[in-house]
Amino acid sequence: YVVNESTSLYNIDINLLNAANDEPLAKLIIAIIKNPQYSWSLDDMARFTYMSRSTFIRRILKATSYTPNVVLRKLRIYVSLNLLRRGIKTEDIYSSIGYESLSGFYQAFKRVMGTAPGDYLSSCK
């Protein structure tokens, strides 16, 4: 119960936390959070973890139940949540977290959070 409540309160994805038990994946997640603007490809992520593509995909799926692209999308959006809460405008956020367009960011945000960035901010107040 406590884990479920705290994960929903702080927008923590328990599946992503599971990757913390796998050191190479944990290091990758930290790297993505620190450098969300980098154009992380599947090859980049596999190389970062010193795994083959197939091993990397298998391990990240096992640890998180997500594909590498879903992990990347979720992490970028979680970084954007912190920026939004600090009052930074969406127009200033999207490129800093790796999106080429504002509409692409909006689509990804809605996919991960289930709502638009503005609606999300309104619900936090």
Q: Which residues make up each language-model segment?
A:
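Generic alpha-helical secondary structure signal
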Residues: 22-26, 78, 88, 115
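Terminal helix-turn-helix DNA-binding modules in bacterial transcription factors
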Residues: 30, 39, 43, 61-100, ...
